[in-house]
Amino acid sequence: LPAGMGWYGALPRSEDSLPERHLGLMQAAEIDDLESRLDKLADELAKTGAGQLPPAVEFADATPPLIAPLLAGKRLAIARDAAYGFIYPANLETLRALGAELVFFSPIAGDSLPACDAVWLPGGYPELHGKALSQNQALWTALKAHVAIGKPLLAECGGLMSLFEQIIDKAGVSHNFGGILPGRAVMQKRLTALGMQIADLPEGQLSGHTFHYSKSETPLTPLLRARTPDGRDGEAIYRMLRSTASYVHIYFPSNPTAIAHLLS
């Protein structure tokens, strides 16, 4: 490190460490005593003296790029609960800047599909909620009808898994899911993919990342494959009518215009 630059790369081991599972830390809403744990960890950090911050720096206000309201008048239904919670705040900000009306629903709670022009099924942990999700047949029936009449659907990672006929969880238990795409997703004991992805879709180039412990088994031929920054083949991207599904978590600000075309 350059002279004068400190390093702080770890916290001391503590019984107050944050709990984790196969895709990393548990989500904040799942940890009842989160604030208390963070306070204790902050106290431990302060004791070391290694976390002293440098003097504050003032930055000029950044001018956000102008985004045309290409989704004005469109109503976008977004799954959001413990099974579908991997949502970048910047993605929601981009959708609002595009003019979309956002309506959230909870597949775990038994919600059916709200009236909408397009649907986004983000990533998460559907494999941990197989029983509740497999019982919500009203939702899957509505999604099938949504896709069949040519309305847009974007499914990412856990969203992709949910579109298959089955998800096989880590215990080997099979759960019936959407049946919108043929095949199944099977949980593995080890990480199956991790890293940045670039998707050159017909709507435009989009950037994102992949991080999952499942494998898909499907007879579908991908529309195309994403690529890694160094040019290697990445995740398969499937297209059925206006539905687009893959393991890639897309960062919407990377190309708002392409997102608007995907969802309109």
Q: Whereabouts are the PLM-identified features?
A:
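Cysteine-nucleophile active-site neighborhood
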Residues: 126-198
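Hydrophobic, well-ordered secondary-structure elements that form the walls
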Residues: 119, 156, 178, 211, ...
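Phosphate-binding active sites in nucleotide-utilizing proteins
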Residues: 74-148
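Structural motif
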Residues: 12, 79-83, 248
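Short acidic, glycine/serine/threonine-rich loops at helix termini
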Residues: 18-26, 89-91, 131, 165-166, ...
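A short acidic, often aromatic-flanked loop/helix-cap motif at beta-alpha or helix-coil junctions
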Residues: 13-19, 110-113, 187-188, 216
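C-terminal and late-domain segments of enzyme folds
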Residues: 47-48, 70-72, 84-94, 98-102, ...
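Internal gly/pro-rich beta-alpha loop/helix module
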Residues: 1-68
